[in-house]
Structures are given as C-alpha cells and as structure tokens.
Swiss-Prot record:
UniProt lineage: Eukaryota, Metazoa, Chordata, Craniata, Vertebrata
Protein name according to UniProt: Polycomb group RING finger protein 5
UniProt feature, compositional bias: Basic and acidic residues: 109-119
Self-association state and partner proteins as the record states: Component of a PRC1-like complex that contains PCGF5, RNF2 and UBE2D3. Interacts with RNF2; the interaction is direct. Interacts with CBX6, CBX7 and CBX8. Interacts with AUTS2; the interaction is direct. Identified in a complex that contains AUTS2, PCGF5, CSNK2B and RNF2.
Cellular component annotations (GO), alphabetically ordered: nucleoplasm; PcG protein complex; PRC1 complex
Amino acid sequence: MATQRKHLVKDFNPYITCYICKGYLIKPTTVTECLHTFCKTCIVQHFEDSNDCPRCGNQVHETNPLEMLRLDNTLEEIIFKLVPGLREQLERESEFWKKNKPQENGQDDMSKVDKPKVDEEGDENQDDKDYHRSDPQIAICLDCLRNNGQSGDNVVKGLMKKFIRCSTRVTVGTIKKFLSLKLKLPSSYELDVLCNGEIMGKDHTMEFIYMTRWRLRGENFRCLNCSASQVCSQDGPLYQSYPMVLQYRPRIDFG
C-alpha cells in the first residue's frame, strides 16, 4: 500500500503569504479585478500611492481602487487552521494594543479620528484616537461648485471660512463629514467632492489626491519654519503655499 505524503505548512506558503510583506496573510483581501490576495493593511497602503495591482501591474480602478477589494474570510479560516497559534497571537496583539495604545499616547478620552480603515462593509473605522497632529499638514480650499438649476443648490452653500489645514492622511470621506457638519446637512444628504473636475473616492487621502490629481507638484510644500521662497528637506509639519482646491456639490446620480 502506498503511503500518503505528509504535507508541511511550508508547502502551502506560496498560497498563504502576502506578496507585499512576505508574511502570512493577515485579514486576506482580494482584488476583484485580478483575484490576487494581500494583507488588508498592505494593499490599502499600496493603493494610497498607486492604482495598479502590486503583483500583476494591471490597473485595478481608474480613481478608487479600494472599491475593488473584498475580504476573503474563507481563506482567513484556512490560514488559521494551517498555521498553529496564529489566531491566538493576533488576538493577544489586539488585546495588548487596546490596553496600552491609549495610555502611551495619553489619549484615553479623545474622540474618533480621520485615519482611513476599510472594514467588511467598506466604511471608515474610527476607533483609533489619534488626531494626527504630528503628520505632515496640507492646506486646502473647499469651494462650492454651483450648477444652475441643479437640485440641491439651495441646500449646499459656500463655507464662510473655506480654507482649512489638515493632516495629509485625511480622507475624502472625512472631508464630506466635515462639510455636512458645517453646512448642517441631513444625515442622508450626499455630496460629491471633486479635484480638477474629477470625482474623488471616499477613501482617497489628501496626499494621494495631491500627488496624483492636483496639477501643482511637491515644490509647493513648504516648511512652517522656512520662508515662502525656500523648500525645506526636513521631515516635519508641512503646508502648501498654494492651497489645493477641492470642490463640492450635491451628489449627482448617473445611474
């Protein structure tokens, strides 16, 4: 009788490891366009700088590749069964950071933040309590785009103070919430946010929009401690001498 070959975990490594970080897939997330799978954190961070799949190089989505991501819960369960102790290790790490991260940052009582995290439904996870004040900053002009005769023009007005400064990690979704709050819009009311006439996805960060959509380039980032004619090479808080202009309007349903 032929003996069955015993399979080792390393035999399955090509199927359960992330192409980006080379570790075991954590919250495996699949790109629906090409069906390549990566760690959720790895692929979300990759899409902040690129619209292409890191493995095959194909464009995932022209403007918002995060819409093409799906969590693979079945693969996650398979990995937990193949790799002894992985589930328990992740649970211990999660508990550790829940207990220690707020105390380390001194932010036990702070409210929700603007850090983008895609969950199973694609909404933003706002459990993190860091305001990102130490992040590079960007200046933005929020301009009301008025279309004559468009439904909703009477509801959406221009802001009294339309210039803001925020973290480069702020997402379009957070900007929409800010506008809804300032304009006192109903919770069901939806807005479009545009840059150079192109509608931006809710998970786009300000840094991503600046680098890929705004016509001005990195030379307009200035250090707060330098003169307007200097470009500072130091790391630290930055601002844009010519604010990036984002326009907003009532959402248009093209369906």
